[in-house]
Amino acid sequence: RWLLPRMHEFYAKHPEILVHIHSRIIREDVQSATQDMTAIICAGTGKWPGYISHKLLTEKLLVVASPAALPDYRCMSPANVAEHSLLNVVSRPGAWSDWFDRHGVDHRHMKSGPHFELTAHLIQAVSAGIGIGLIPQILVQDELHSGELVALFEPIESGRSYYLVYATRYQNLRPL
């Protein structure tokens, strides 16, 4: 959602480079993820032995909702959020617990909602009014600008960033 809109500009600047895009969900196993590829973009800490990483952006998470499904969104407190169906991404099992801990709310009282493998599906579910989502800010920019979704609070840093990662054997490869 954030990469493809930028590819036109990249190709204009670098017409000699051809990029093949494959989507995978990886869990810090950069070696297997890069097995058939020269470089990958992944989220993490940026520290993978045997690999070079270049930070692209720091991830910030936003609590978002559909204003049609939550008309009183302007009056929400972190404790109020726990009373609603909280949508989850399978790859981030503790995201909501961490968010509540940061806001001084006992996460054991939260109302866990459906789980989604893809963040794109979670965004669609939030837009459809199924619940409240905790989503990387960069992935919901269009929905926020259009008013389809609203942010309930200021974004918080997740502790993760997105990186361009490649094996050290490719460090002298010109396109990288």
Which ranges hold each PLM region?
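Short hydrophobic beta-strand segments
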Residues: 1, 86-87, 164
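C-terminal regulatory
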Residues: 30-34, 46-130, 135, 139-159
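Central regulatory/effector-binding core of bacterial HTH transcription factors
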Residues: 1-48
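Generic beta-structure capping elements
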Residues: 22-24, 42-44, 66, 91, ...
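A late-sequence structural motif
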Residues: 155-176
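Residues that form or flank phosphate/diphosphate-binding pockets in enzymes
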Residues: 2, 73, 174
